[in-house]
Amino acid sequence: MDEQSVESIAEVFRCFICMEKLRDARLCPHCSKLCCFSCIRRWLTEQRAQCPHCRAPLQLRELVNCRWAEEVTQQLDTLQLCSLTKHEENEKDKCENHHEKLSVFCWTCKKCICHQCALWGGMHGGHTFKPLAEIYEQHVTKVNEEVAKLRRRLMELISLVQEVERNVEAVRNAKDERVREIRNAVEMMIARLDTQLKNKLITLMGQKTSLTQETELLESLLQEVEHQLRSCSKSELISKSSEILMMFQQVHRKPMASFVTTPVPPDFTSELVPSYDSATFVLENFSTLRQRADPVYSPPLQVSGLCWRLKVYPDGNGVVRGYYLSVFLELSAGLPETSKYEYRVEMVHQSCNDPTKNIIREFASDFEVGECWGYNRFFRLDLLANEGYLNRQNDTVILRFQVRSPTFFQKCRDQHWYITQLEAAQTGYIQQINNLKERLTIELSRTQKSRDLSPPDNHLSPQNDDSPETRTKKAGSCSDMLLEGGPTCASVRETKEDEDEEEKIQNEDYHHELSDGDLDLDLVGEDEVNHLDGSSSSASSTATSNTEENDIDEETMSGENDVEYNSMELEEGELMEDAAAAGPPGSSHSYVGASSRMSRRTHLCSAATSSLLDIDPLILIHLLDLKDRSSMENLWGLQPRPSASLLQPTASYSRKDKDQRKQQAMWRVPSDLKMLKRLKTQMAEVRCMKTDVKTTLSDIKGSSVASTDMQTNLFCADQAALTTCGPENSGRLQDLGMELLAKSSVAGCYIRNPTNKKNSPKSARAIAGSLSLRRAVDSGENSRSKGDCQVLAEGSSGSSQSGSRHSSPRALTHGIIGDLLPKSEDRQCKALDSDAVVVAVFNGLPTVEKRRKMVTLGTNAKGGRLEGMQMADLESHSEAGEVQPTLPEGASAAPEEGMSSDSDIECDTENEEQEEHTSMGAFNDPFLAQPPDEDSHSSFPDGEQIDPENLHFNPDEGGGR
């Protein structure tokens, strides 16, 4: 079929409206012409309801659907394409040189040629030839394979497109669902608001109705009275005047106060937008601030972990300086990403209390940390005083700024970020505490290993056994002996001199390491809390814009130019109150000569603290747990303060360490007169209680003086020493001991002030003294089994020391030891303490005239030694059961009663201390005193002399044991 015939057939199957190929063909029932459905529908609906070809009336439903026409048009298209392709092939498949049909493929040249080129052309001599049809089939096969791959790829892409379309549809549906939810929620919120409005209106309408009824009643009454006045004659008015006055009285019986109602507040809580968080900034001395070019910052406003403050230029900023008041809001701490916040700045009209005259500017801006948004031209400076915004009497301007998150969702996000920051800080604190615990455990294990490796010296007491397993039995038997009135015997644990020195050096090194760790923890904690509180000012700045509003401040927020109000550094104010008397020894700079006294006290207290560390590792672990809980409780407020008596180093530091601690304490330890006054008041109360205790002791001593005088210089075998007191006096002495222990705990409550003498050596000495009572009793039970007798004056003095004003805190003397001891052992120790005090009272608790004659074991670096003569006397009298107090030199006396807390301990001079060390080292025989874990301190009331006649015990009972 030629091209013309194909074209004529194609003309038949062409739409007579658009003259294009038929698409969804329709047939006119009148003229049988074919046309596109879209074309005829558009014609019938927009033009006329008739056929465009035959003009016959035609409706859309009358059209005939010609489904066969589409197949015919496709076949015509194929015929046209084939005819065109064949024609083109005939033109292209000819050789350009010979005009012959291309029939050969040169495999060497990769080119299609004719047979003449292959045979006679001369250009393809020796080449490999293949039939053109074969090569064509190979290429068609390859192309079809690739086409199949592309079709598969196309189908995959189509499926992906369909999946994306489904995803788009799902997203739209989800959005529509959220919109419906929001609409429902908003409708419910609106309904709740309508309910609130209805309730408020019901209340108001009830008030209005009662008032309206009363006004209508009064109006009708007035009209009636006026009518009577106009219409009645004089006689009638006189006769009705009583009735009218009675009506008036009835009206006045109801007071006006009954009509005064409580106004209904016009506020409705929004469930979508949070309320504003506001703060007020009062610019005092405004005229003086105008003369400066520096900005003024308001106190910080903490909102959900964000720190906001107002930045005010009293004389204007930039080009408006001298003309306008510039006010900006700064985000000094918060989330790292940019967030939008709504803010409002209000200047209060001070001439009257009308809030409608306040200048209010509000806007919403995107804030970053350190960025300022506000108003460069907030208000004209020349109109401040004239308009009433500047109080000329006080020279003040009051600004109120408010800020909020746009939605509750953003506010919850800010709070979640703040909680994350706090949890991270808490994790850091816990990690540091665990590190300190590990260090403490390592040091304690190292000390225990060194103690186990060094062999004990059993030269004097080879059968000494003071293991922890036998302490319970010893305490019980010793308490029974004290209750029976028998003599108290105490054995002295003896160790080598080099072992004592090694343990003291290790303990002092441990104190230094622990103190440095605690100090690092304290300082790091303060820095992190300062960062969380947002009190640190940001130094970042952004570009400025001198537009009318929403100007970004450009000036650098330097700390030197900031005029701070109400102490922007919050932690500095907190440290002023409780660091005046809590610094390490030698670091106080508030008093003249305090450093010298504190250094001497540190020397006296070093051995006492070392002995406390050697007592039991569980005690220190428990103390550190207490500190851990205390720091967790104070995490949101003040910094954790470790216990000064144990966790703060009391050993003598090197000069370099002292200088470093002085520099660290200079900026955080100012003097505080209020704290000193409070301290003096508490010390006066403690002195009063001590006077009461002394009075009671004097009464009991007077009642027992008859029994003690009868036994002067007699050491017989009868039991007349304590039986003369009778059962009543014995019970009274026992009750007195319990009362004295109770009063000592009360005195410890008064002394327990964390800001007063935290690091006093007396406190550590009293701790060791109170704990040494149990050690002395344990050693006494051990020595009683061997027939040796020693003095219990050291243990009893430790008990009396705990009742003085230098007693240790209750958390150390009662809480910790009570937790470590079993219940049965605790009850035995209580009876033991009370009986030890009874024996000390019965013996008069004599004192020595000089302070250096008092027993203070553990204060010497090498440990207290017993003199040879005193030990010989002790051995000579031990057979008869005599107990004499041994007083080695180098001990310090107890404080006098009238001395204040700052001058309680007046230690010996350096020369005297040297003499003491010289005299102590002069002995060849190493008579060792109690080791550091059992040392104690003795203190006696002033004015009483020591006398062997007052120390009588029953020798029979002691010898029998």
UniProtKB/Swiss-Prot annotation:
Residues 132-234, 419-450 form a coiled coil. It is a peripheral membrane protein. Its EC number is 2.3.2.27. GO terms for molecular function: chromatin binding; histone H2AK119 ubiquitin ligase activity; protein homodimerization activity; transcription coactivator activity; tumor necrosis factor receptor binding; ubiquitin protein ligase activity; ubiquitin protein ligase binding; zinc ion binding. Zn(2+) binds at residues 95, 98, 117, 124. Residues 504-514, 776-787 have a biased composition (Basic and acidic residues). InterPro entries: Bbox_C, MATH/TRAF_dom, TRAF-like, TRIM37_MATH, TRIM_RBCC_E3_ubiq-ligases, Znf_B-box, Znf_RING, Znf_RING/FYVE/PHD. Residues 535-545, 795-806 have a biased composition (Low complexity). Residues 447-514, 529-561, 645-665, 776-811, 874-961 are annotated as: Disordered. Pathway: Protein modification; protein ubiquitination. The modification N-acetylmethionine is found at residue 1. Highly expressed in testis and brain. In embryonic tissues, expressed in epithelia, including ducts of the developing pancreas, epithelium of the midgut and nasal epithelium. In adult, detected in the central and peripheral nervous systems, including enteric ganglia, retina and the adrenal medulla (at protein level). One of its GO terms (cellular component) is perinuclear region of cytoplasm. CDD domains: Bbox2_TRIM37_C-VIII, MATH_TRIM37, mRING-HC-C4C4_TRIM37_C-VIII. Associates with the PRC2/EED-EZH2 complex. Residues 548-561, 903-915 have a biased composition (Acidic residues). The keyword Phosphoprotein applies. The modification Phosphoserine is found at residue 454. Residues 276-403 form the MATH domain. E3 ubiquitin-protein ligase required to prevent centriole reduplication. Probably acts by ubiquitinating positive regulators of centriole reduplication. Mediates monoubiquitination of 'Lys-119' of histone H2A (H2AK119Ub), a specific tag for epigenetic transcriptional repression: associates with some Polycomb group (PcG) multiprotein PRC2-like complex and mediates repression of target genes. Belongs to the TRIM/RBCC family. Its main location: nucleus. This is E3 ubiquitin-protein ligase TRIM37. It catalyses: S-ubiquitinyl-[E2 ubiquitin-conjugating enzyme]-L-cysteine + [acceptor protein]-L-lysine = [E2 ubiquitin-conjugating enzyme]-L-cysteine + N(6)-ubiquitinyl-[acceptor protein]-L-lysine. It comes from Mus musculus.
